[in-house]
Amino acid sequence: NSRRVDAMKDFIDDAVKNGSNLIHGGSRHKDKGFFWEPTLIENINEGSKMMTEEIFGPILALFKFSDYDDVIEKANSLNYGLASYVYTTSEVLQEKMAKEIIAGGVSINTASPMHPEIPYGGIKESGIGYEGGIDAIYSFLHKKNINIV
């Protein structure tokens, strides 16, 4: 919808204004419809909107980190925790990051969504309840405790 296209433009404009480098995309697709080009951007300033708000669009922001602890600290410092995506060939890092990143889901070496039969939901300020699996149904139910003496 037009609000998401406007939001994507705001994210990119803000990032570029704050010194980020636009590598690919960064605009409405052919100025028609409500499609945003897949966008790749690097050198994101920590004060940029895309570091404090959920993007929900085809923007991939690339970051450089000083070491492993810096990666975990920055990932977990965000107010949101819907999903996290990790790409590494190291099985040790795969396991360690999956455990240490605070998010509703962590995908390793894939950008595909979670499996539909497995409950999935965000944490922190991301998402409401769960989707997928029996826990998704439970999130729409209210339990009632009745005591009769």
Q: PLM ranges: what are they?
A:
Residues 28, 35-149:
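Conserved C-terminal structural/oligomerization subdomain of aldehyde/semialdehyde dehydrogenase
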Residues 12:
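Acidic-enriched catalytic cores of C-N bond-cleaving enzymes acting on peptides and small amides
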Residues 19-28:
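Short secondary-structure junctions
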Residues 1-9:
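Short beta-strand to alpha-helix junction loop
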